Amino acid sequence: MKKLALLLSLALSFSAIADDHAPTSSYLVESIPFTLKDGKTMADMMAMKDEFAAVAQASGLQYSAFVMTPHYMSQSSAPIAGSFDAVWLGFSPSATAIGAGYEGYMENGQELEAKFDELRTMNQRSLMRGEMVHEGDPSDGGFGMFRTCTLNDGADMEELRAALKARGAAFEKAGATASTHMWYGGIGIPNEMQGSVIIVRIFPSMEAWGQAFDRYFAGDFAKEERLLNETATCGPVRTYFGTPFYSASAG
């Protein structure tokens, strides 16, 4: 089964920009934190996959989705208002694609949306631009590390991109397999997220994350960490497991 790394690679395959000073791949990411209603479980949520796929295909939805369940994290570290059980993430190649897809979904998916409403509640929906700044290994499985950062005075996005590329290359040289992304410029984000950047590292599996974690503390990445710290101030790391919900076909 395809999981987080493969789904994200598929979403990214829609759009690539070949410029040393621009993102390797760009996309839009929709984030919907949700809480399951009393008596409902994540199994009930995942049981909706086939119905969602049918509506998405009928609507021409260029949109790959999966459910992120928190693992190592504290509520205060997440840029989410209120408590939540999981986060729905959806990837689309452009605003045009997501807008056209939503029009189709609103026409074809009202009954399905009513079923979702019986399962979960949500009080936040945001849309951010995403960039892949370092490409790692796609494979089965998915474990994500997230940090919320703000640019330091005098720093810009190009410098942050360069710092993340340098870190990704150094980690890869040490044997890490993660892809590195940054998300920013959100619509619908909380006030405290204004001007922030979410740095995301996607590992093929939790074991791959554990191997990278051990190698990080066994190695010397002082140069790369200094470059990042000179560019941005970041909060604590939080992690999630990713489970696929729907995979759009590229092209």
Model-derived features: where do they sit?
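Gram-negative bacterial Sec-dependent N-terminal signal peptides
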Residues: 1-18
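Short S/T/G/P-rich N-terminal loop/turn motif that feeds into the first structured element of a domain
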Residues: 18-251
